[in-house]
């Protein structure tokens, strides 16, 4: 069985990485799909986010990383994936993700959404929080993989944002 783990991963956090590791135990293949969203101004290019994920998951053999545009459910269908993985940090995540899951099911009933609860130690993490802490000079080493921390420190030290 294959599972699709979609997201912007801008940046990849240790919460994302925890879900990837756990999914790799549960599924034969974990496809990490990096969303190309033209309506947002990402901190990192899609290609850099893919590089960060590759570096951070290099010890895992069941991982495939790609980018996509458009609807996640259409991406899943095109890859012949039956499951979409979503992480839940809090009840607010569940409400939002449940809406998306129902929408996806209305488009394609063959694709199920699977929810995994985030480890408690990562429940406060979000890409937005990480960027804000980094922007104000805070330590993010316990929030993101080393490659991401290095990239963010470089960006915010140089004032590129």
UniProtKB/Swiss-Prot annotation:
Pathway in which the depicted protein is active: Cofactor biosynthesis; coenzyme A biosynthesis; CoA from (R)-pantothenate: step 4/5
A Pfam family recorded for this sequence: CTP_transf_like
Enzyme class per UniProt: transferase
Swiss-Prot/TrEMBL cofactor(s): Mg(2+)
Alphabetical list of SUPFAM superfamilies matching this protein: Nucleotidylyl transferase
Residues holding ATP: 8-9, 16, 87-89, 97, 122-128
Enzyme Commission number(s) of this protein: 2.7.7.3
Reactions that this protein is recorded to catalyse: (R)-4'-phosphopantetheine + ATP + H(+) = 3'-dephospho-CoA + diphosphate
Keyword line: ATP-binding, Coenzyme A biosynthesis, Cytoplasm, Magnesium, Nucleotide-binding, Nucleotidyltransferase, Transferase
Annotated site residues (Transition state stabilizer) in this chain: 16
Biological processes per GO annotation: coenzyme A biosynthetic process
GO cellular component, one term: cytoplasm
Annotated GO MF terms: ATP binding; pantetheine-phosphate adenylyltransferase activity
Residue numbers binding substrate: 8, 40, 72, 86
CDD domains: PPAT
Subunit structure: Homohexamer.
Task of the protein: Reversibly transfers an adenylyl group from ATP to 4'-phosphopantetheine, yielding dephospho-CoA (dPCoA) and pyrophosphate.
Protein name as annotated: Phosphopantetheine adenylyltransferase
Lineage, opening ranks: Bacteria, Bacillati, Cyanobacteriota, Cyanophyceae, Synechococcales
Gene (UniProt): coaD
